[in-house]
């Protein structure tokens, strides 16, 4: 089965590498917590031990996940300034008097609260390939809105 290719900005790769380094460096602390918790006796009723093991398991799962993403990622090249929306662009949309700004990134980096939307999201899909000044209809689960593309950076 073919591995999924993840699309990441260079900033996204740097953030993942920082998180990976932090998780790897926490391994010894987690091992020490498990060792200390074992000293409390019966492991079947030892909440500290169970908690430490769960934290260790979550960290190892996240380490494997990040390593997989980094090993199967493609860097989004900084798009040239042009009049067509592509992956990596920041787009300013206008709906009457309301303006919204989105940066189109790969799904791993998506963070709607920070204005980073996935190229796989309804908004991302609606914007990709559209041109400056073009009207775009964006369908989301809650509504359908029409925006004009005011800026592409």
What do these predicted regions represent?
Residues 76-153:
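Non-DNA-binding regulatory cores of transcription-related proteins
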Residues 24-27, 70-74, 131:
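Conserved NTP-handling cores and scaffolds of large molecular machines
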